[in-house]
From Swiss-Prot:
GO biological process: cysteinyl-tRNA aminoacylation
Binding site for ATP: K409
Name of the encoding gene: CARS1
UniProt GO cellular component terms: cytoplasm
Organism: Macaca fascicularis (Crab-eating macaque)
Cofactor(s) the protein needs: Zn(2+)
Protein name as it appears in the record: Cysteine--tRNA ligase, cytoplasmic
Described function: Catalyzes the ATP-dependent ligation of cysteine to tRNA(Cys).
Length: 748
């Protein structure tokens, strides 16, 4: 034994060598970078922290679907980076509340309000409109842009139409209500025309800075309400140009000190030639082919900054304003160069530079901002920081068209966010955006929205069906069921789809592919549930719940499902917060079972009135409460909580279909009745009389009433005689049937 023991000690067993699996290279996030026009691996500068600046709106009018295109798309990208890829995103957005458009619109609104307060007489109004039409006509003739020309022509036409009734009323010396009504119509139609004219003549007299702050403050509030309604997350920090004027002045001064800016007549301009000639810098990084495009550059400078005297202040036409000397009728702030206001491009540079420093990870904006706005932002910021990497990744969202056309007020396809939300929910709009690439053109049309509505309905039905399965009572161990081949196959498909979705998100956040993969996964689940139902077997609860939870999680990440956030611990401990479904469903289940019992008795006892009441509960009462009862043949009632408006819409569509069927049935019955009446009327005619009234065809008849001569007195040919004989015999048969009808009771 001792020897044996020693043997064991000598040959002691040890664990075999272990080798890690080869594995696969993890998929990395790539983003389409406008600086390279390629998809690049996304590598933040500081670990998982991501600094992100997004160009916000210029707030002088209602937000429209073009704004929604950018802000919903960036909201989706931000959520995916934060909640899916788990980056620590610091998101900054600006509000442009000092701008040429704002100044002009504020002055126009103020002057038009003053004009209305004076209550101009009809004759004076007509005189003013004619005066305003003169410069307007010159502007119309000089306009070459077809969309803008169409808009101006429409304004001119509508003003002329509104002018005529008032001119006639004045000529006829009408007074009172009739004239006042014509005045109101003309004031409404000529508002833009008169506002522009008043601004050109009196705009320089507007000096109160509060007039220029009132307008953007109002529209900023409307913008935030629109974003909240669209479920767009608010930025981590919001910057307003009006609150950063001192920082902008300092930013401009340093650019001048670094040799890239120059002062001219109280304004400060960026020296593009000096910057481009520097070995450290490049001008026009985003759209180099657009450098020198004077039309684009002038649009970037603003309507109030492209007069001949302004343009003459520049060393080069390619230079752009960092600071503008204020003219009479423009707001102003003190600075080393005299009273003035910021240029458009410098505003973003100063605010983003103040908060995010010399280099940010992501800068975002709409596609049409690439040049000159973003190229000029890059230039002046890199001139300030003396670097070549102010932005690492530039993301630009695609255009939005309206039913294939460029969005334009002149084409009457300018849709505000509020108007869009009257037709479709925020979720439906977001689903439409998710079903398209964020960087490509999106066509906002009835077809696009119908696809989104169908997708929403498709997913919702799946979630409702899974909820119904999960509500089926089981004991605590019964919720874990043995898997068969069908469950194993569905689970494999589930993990395959998760991989495909991850790869799509890594590929420039390709939500379009993600949505298709999710649709395919739901289709596989539907086939599985249908097969189990056909076999009278219960689907696997845990598997379907896992898939439904995953899909819900993804939709929450995309912002398609809202989550209520709360601070701190829930009141009353965990699990006590109100959940409508878990609270209401037990009561609905009791109601459903009671209704089933009542229906069973009503069918057995043949009480149709009770069955009708039961159907009315299902079809008329419960939908008003957002509850759907489904009565599948031979199976228990399925209870679903659905959005009330969705159910009411479904009910209305069902009623319309039924009404259409009823109308078609009535129409068919009416046609049948008319045909029978016509047939009866024909049957009543004795064959001997059937041709006698046709004097336009025949002139002579035999003793039986058969025609022998045509209308011109010529004897009928053999063929014609044979034809009328055949008609005569057919009528003879019909008349015979008619005479027999009272005897056999066919007609009463």
């Amino acid at each position: 034994m001792a020897g044996s023991s020693g043997q064991q000690g000598k040959g002691r067993r040890v664990q075999p060598q272990w080798s890690p699996p080869a594995g696969t290279q993890p998929c990395r996030l790539h983003l389409y970078n406008s600086l390279t026009r390629n998809k690049e691996v996304f590598i933040p500068q500081d670990g998982k922290k991501v600094t992100w600046y997004c160009c916000g709106p210029t707030v002088y009018d209602a937000s429209h679907m073009g704004h929604a295109r950018s802000y919903i798309s960036f909201d989706i990208l931000r959520r995916v980076l934060k909640d899916y890829f788990k980056f620590d995103v610091f998101y900054c957005m600006n509000i442009t509340d000092i701008d040429d458009k704002i100044i002009k619109r504020a002055r126009q609104n103020h002057l038009f309000e003053q004009y209305l307060e004076k209550r101009p007489e009809a004759a004076q109004l007509l005189e003013d409109v004619q005066a305003a039409l003169k410069p307007f006509s010159v502007k119309l003739n000089e306009t070459t842009d077809p969309d803008k020309k169409q808009m101006l022509e429409r304004i001119q036409h509508e003003v002329q139409l509104a002018t005529e009734p008032l001119e006639k009323a004045v000529q006829s010396r009408l007074t009172g209500e009739e004239v006042n009504s014509c005045v109101e119509v003309l004031l409404e139609e000529a508002k833009d025309l008169l506002s522009d004219w008043l601004d050109s003549t009196l705009g320089s007299d507007v000096t109160d800075n509060s007039i220029f702050s009132k307008l953007p403050k109002f529209w900023e509030g409307e913008f935030h309400r629109d974003m909240e309604a669209l479920n767009v997350l608010p930025p981590d920090v919001l910057t307003r140009v009006s609150e950063y004027v001192p920082e902008i002045v300092n930013f401009v001064q340093k650019i001048v000190d670094n040799g890239y800016g120059y002062v001219s007549d109280g304004s400060v301009y960026f020296d593009t030639a000096k910057f481009a000639s520097s070995e450290k810098h490049s001008y026009g990084k985003l759209v180099p082919e657009a450098v020198g495009d004077q039309k684009a550059l002038q649009e970037g400078e603003g309507d109030l900054s492209i007069s001949a005297d302004r343009l003459s202040e520049k060393r080069s036409p390619n230079d752009f304003a960092l600071w503008k000397a204020s003219k009479p009728g423009e707001p102003s702030w003190p600075c080393p160069w005299g009273k003035g206001r910021p240029g458009w491009h410098i505003e973003c540079s100063a605010m983003a530079g103040t908060l995010l420093g010399a280099s940010m990870d992501i800068h975002g904006g709409g596609f049409d901002l690439r040049f000159p706005h973003h190229d000029n932002e890059l230039a002046q910021s890199e001139a300030y920081f003396e670097n070549d990497c102010w932005v690492r990744y530039f993301l630009h969202t695609g255009h939005l068209t309206i039913t294939g056309c460029k969005m334009s007020k002149s084409l009457k396809n300018f849709i505000t966010i509020k108007d869009a939300l009257k037709k479709h929910s925020a979720r439906q709009l977001r689903l439409a955006f998710l079903m398209h690439s964020w960087k490509d053109t999106l066509d906002y049309s009835s077809n696009t929205m119908e696809s989104a509505l169908q997708y929403e309905k498709f997913l919702n039905e799946f979630f409702l069906n899974v909820k119904d399965i999960l509500r089926a009572p089981v004991d605590i161990t019964g919720q874990f069921e043995k898997w068969g081949e069908e469950e194993a196959e569905l689970n494999k498909n589930f993990y395959d789809k998760k991989t495909a979705i991850h790869e799509a998100l890594c590929d420039n956040v390709d939500t379009r592919t993600v949505m298709e993969e999710m649709r395919a996964l739901v289709s596989q689940c539907n086939l599985y549930m249908a097969a189990r139902k056909a076999m009278r077997k219960r689907p696997n609860r845990a598997l379907l719940e896992n898939i439904a939870l995953y899909l819900t999680h993804m939709l929450k990440i995309f912002g398609a499902i809202e989550e209520e956030s709360s601070l701190g611990f829930p009141v009353g401990g965990s699990g006590t917060s109100l959940n409508l479904e878990s609270t209401v469903m037990p009561y609905l289940q009791v109601l459903s079972e009671f209704r089933e019992g009542v229906r069973k008795i009503a069918r057995e006892q043949k009480v149709p009135e009770v069955l009708q009441l039961s159907d009315a509960l299902r079809d008329d009462i419960l939908p008003e409460l957002g509850v759907r009862f489904e009565d599948p043949e031979g199976l228990p009632t399925v209870v679903k909580l659905v959005d009330r408006n969705t159910l009411l819409k479904e009910r209305e569509e069902k009623r319309q279909v039924e009404e259409e069927k009823r109308k078609k049935k009535e129409e068919a019955a009416r046609r049948k009745q008319e045909q029978e009446a016509a047939k009866l009327a024909k049957m009543k005619i004795p064959p001997s009389e059937m041709f006698l009234s046709e004097t336009d065809k025949y002139s002579k008849f035999d003793e039986n009433g058969l025609p022998t001569h045509d209308a011109e007195g010529k004897e009928l040919s053999k063929g014609q005689a044979k034809k009328v004989k055949k008609l005569f015999e057919a009528q003879e048969k019909l008349y015979k049937e008619y005479l027999q009808m009272p005897q056999n009771g066919s007609f009463q």
